[in-house]
Amino acid sequence: MYVIVEINGQQFKAEEGKKLFVHHIQNAENGATVEFEKVLLVDNNGTVTVGAPTVEGAKVVCEVVSPLVKGDKVLVFHKKRRKGYRKLNGHRQQFTELTIKQVIA
């Protein structure tokens, strides 16, 4: 059984026991449980239920493993040819690591 759930504007395929890295969730504490009720699709052993826009009564219960995980560094380089203009910027995206404890559908 798996579901498609929307978390912070992104859609994820969720199954029990899987780990997810989602965009940083504010005020998330280590070991806290978080529920997401925007379930868009439920596949229960081949029986597919598609929500319009969400499936009623379905939710995903997750546990916060790590509230702040930094992703890989992304480098952004700007250059104007023949002018000597070069600029290098970089950032690391912040994520929250979740473990899916229960899928209720």
Curated annotation (Swiss-Prot):
GO terms for molecular function: rRNA binding; structural constituent of ribosome. The keyword DNA-binding does not apply. SUPFAM superfamilies: L21p-like (SSF141091). GO terms for biological process: translation. Keywords: Ribonucleoprotein, Ribosomal protein, RNA-binding, rRNA-binding. Coiled coil: none annotated. One of its GO terms (cellular component) is ribosome. It holds the Pfam family Ribosomal_L21p. Part of the 50S ribosomal subunit. Contacts protein L20. PANTHER family: 50S RIBOSOMAL PROTEIN L21, LARGE RIBOSOMAL SUBUNIT PROTEIN BL21M. Belongs to the bacterial ribosomal protein bL21 family. This protein binds to 23S rRNA in the presence of protein L20. This is Large ribosomal subunit protein bL21. The lineage of its organism: Bacteria, Pseudomonadati, Bacteroidota, Bacteroidia, Bacteroidales. The gene is rplU.
